[in-house]
Amino acid sequence: MSERKEGRGKGKGKKKERGSGKKPESAAGSQSPALPPRLKEMKSQESAAGSKLVLRCETSSEYSSLRFKWFKNGNELNRKNKPQNIKIQKKPGKSELRINKASLADSGEYMCKVISKLGNDSASANITIVESNEIITGMPASTEGAYVSSESPIRISVSTEGANTSSSTSTSTTGTSHLVKCAEKEKTFCVNGGECFMVKDLSNPSRYLCKCQPGFTGARCTENVPMKVQNQEKAEELYQKRVLTITGICIALLVVGIMCVVAYCKTKKQRKKLHDRLRQSLRSERNNMMNIANGPHHPNPPPENVQLVNQYVSKNVISSEHIVEREAETSFSTSHYTSTAHHSTTVTQTPSHSWSNGHTESILSESHSVIVMSSVENSRHSSPTGGPRGRLNGTGGPRECNSFLRHARETPDSYRDSPHSERYVSAMTTPARMSPVDFHTPSSPKSPPSEMSPPVSSMTVSMPSMAVSPFMEEERPLLLVTPPRLREKKFDHHPQQFSSFHHNPAHDSNSLPASPLRIVEDEEYETTQEYEPAQEPVKKLANSRRAKRTKPNGHIANRLEVDSNTSSQSSNSESETEDERVGEDTPFLGIQNPLAASLEATPAFRLADSRTNPAGRFSTQEEIQARLSSVIANQDPIAV
């Protein structure tokens, strides 16, 4: 136990010894004299404008309690009055002054001062800021000291530690220097408008600096700066303007193209519509033209089986006790056409006559010449004055014939254009084939030979023209005698009774019946709606011997002309055979001049035995006129 106490006591004694040992050392140190802090020398700097500079102020002693202060041209730089581009940083034993983006205003003398209990110390440095592109060059020796500036010199202390970011070259110098403008004589040192400066240094000879204009460089501003875009903002604006211009042009072209396409589509549609309308109008016009060319849409009867039934009934009612009228039917059928060796066949029907044999017979004869003449209508029919119309009436009197001949002579040319002329008739007829037409006359075997049945006058059929024979002995039209077999059959097949009203005793004695009437029927004659009203009133039976129509007691009685002298049966038969021979030898429309032929045939009508009419006799001149009326204008070669 006593050892531990000793040990403790020993330890305590050691600590005391240590503490007592230090105290005499500090006492000894405090007794030595203390030295004030000393600053290291700062170096002056020269730099171009816009560069970064750093000034450092350091002490050589290790004294901790030190304060640093910075001054510029004798003015303290504190937070209130220091520029924004100058910053002061404090570190242990040193202080730094940083200048960012130095400018000419930053040039001057900077001083650093250290303050402590032991003492104070200071150090200074000059900072020279030069514009860019200025190069310090040496002047010749002859010019040194020749210039004395009246301006106060500027001392520049340049430190080698400064950072120079300028493109111009610089030389570091020690000591102070002066930068003044060149005199008038030395301004020619810089060319191309450069500004001249002179740097004076006590230790070094004076030098000249040149501040060049934009676009030039070099020691004397003799070199040209390479071509480059100096202002980037202007270049960007120009580029943007160009881009906008090109974009606007492209958009305008696109809009124009779209408008062109739309306009083309619209015009194409309109053109298509117009073409469709034109096509429809052309189709309608073609249809109308075809309808006009084809005529009205009414069914036409087929030409293979044409049946024409003409029924004519007298409007004046006659008692059945006196007159029995029968309707005449004329039937044409193409299935029963008969072909002959000649060009045409004309069917001629004659009413029942008795040639001194006391019997009424129906004669069916065929001649080999077609002379179709329905009626002759004067051109004055269409005039406003309503001129008379001449027509050939089978039952008319001499007055009608004379008036007809008069008007026919007055207008020979206008007749050719009449719808009743041979041109129209021959154009619608084909006289190559004819079908026989049976004409049944209601007659009785007991009737006198001079009597004629009334239906002959009541029938109105297209009236053919008659050919005039140049022979003296021919006084009747060209006929073919019906065979006896056919005569007997017809005589037996049509027995009829006549009323006493039709019996004329004045014609019983010494009179021959009139020449047989003939009816020329064309097999292909078409009665259209246009010509039916004009042809119906003029379709009358005609013969070389005229019959006169009389109206006794309101009834129609047709009496034929008969000859006053009766001829023998042999002479009549001879004349019929001669007529048959002449009819066979007569060509179709052989007479070219009807007027000359009728004049040549004039003696043929001057016979001793003249045929008389109960109402009056025809003179020879009237018979000639009747012949002329039957053949007028039917020999037109153009119509044939």
Curated annotation (Swiss-Prot):
Which UniProt keyword terms apply here?
Cell membrane, Chromosomal rearrangement, Disulfide bond, EGF-like domain, Glycoprotein, Growth factor, Immunoglobulin domain, Membrane, Nucleus, Secreted, Transmembrane, Transmembrane helix
The site (Breakpoint for translocation to form gamma-heregulin) lies at A34
A GO molecular function annotation here is:
ErbB-3 class receptor binding
Residue segments, region Disordered: 1-53, 334-360, 375-399, 433-461, 524-588
GO CC aspect terms: apical plasma membrane; extracellular region; extracellular space; glutamatergic synapse; membrane; nucleoplasm; plasma membrane
- The chain's Extracellular topological domains, given as residue ranges, are 20-242
Q: Identify the residues that the record assigns to the EGF-like domain, covering every copy.
A: 178-222
Give the Basic residues compositional bias ranges.
542-552
* InterPro entries to which the protein is assigned, alphabetical: EGF-like_dom, Ig-like_dom, Ig-like_dom_sf, Ig-like_fold, Ig_I-set, Ig_sub, Ig_sub2, Neuregulin
Q: Topology check: give the Cytoplasmic ranges.
A: 266-640
Glycosylation annotated at which residues? N120, N126, N164
- Residue ranges spanning the membrane: these are 243-265
Q: Which residues form the Ig-like C2-type domain?
A: 37-128
Taxonomic superkingdom: Eukaryota
In UniProt terms, what is the effect of altering K185E?
Defective in integrin-binding and in inducing ERBB3 phosphorylation. No effect on ERBB3-binding, defective in integrin-binding and in ternary complex formation with ERBB3 and integrins, and defective in inducing NRG1-ERBB signaling
Annotated SUPFAM superfamilies: EGF/Laminin, Immunoglobulin
Recorded hits in Pfam families, A to Z, give: EGF, I-set, Neuregulin
Q: Which residues form a coiled coil?
A: none
Biased-composition ranges, Low complexity, are 334-350, 563-574
Write out the domain note. The cytoplasmic domain may be involved in the regulation of trafficking and proteolytic processing. Regulation of the proteolytic processing involves initial intracellular domain dimerization. ERBB receptor binding is elicited entirely by the EGF-like domain.
Which disease is this protein implicated in? A chromosomal aberration involving NRG1 produces gamma-heregulin. Translocation t(8;11) with TENM4. The translocation fuses the 5'-end of TENM4 to NRG1 (isoform 8). The product of this translocation was first thought to be an alternatively spliced isoform. Gamma-heregulin is a soluble activating ligand for the ERBB2-ERBB3 receptor complex and acts as an autocrine growth factor in a specific breast cancer cell line (MDA-MB-175). Not detected in breast carcinoma samples, including ductal, lobular, medullary, and mucinous histological types, neither in other breast cancer cell lines.
Name the job this protein performs: Direct ligand for ERBB3 and ERBB4 tyrosine kinase receptors. Concomitantly recruits ERBB1 and ERBB2 coreceptors, resulting in ligand-stimulated tyrosine phosphorylation and activation of the ERBB receptors.
Q: Which family does it belong to?
A: Belongs to the neuregulin family.
The molecule here is called Pro-neuregulin-1, membrane-bound isoform
Identify the species of origin: Homo sapiens
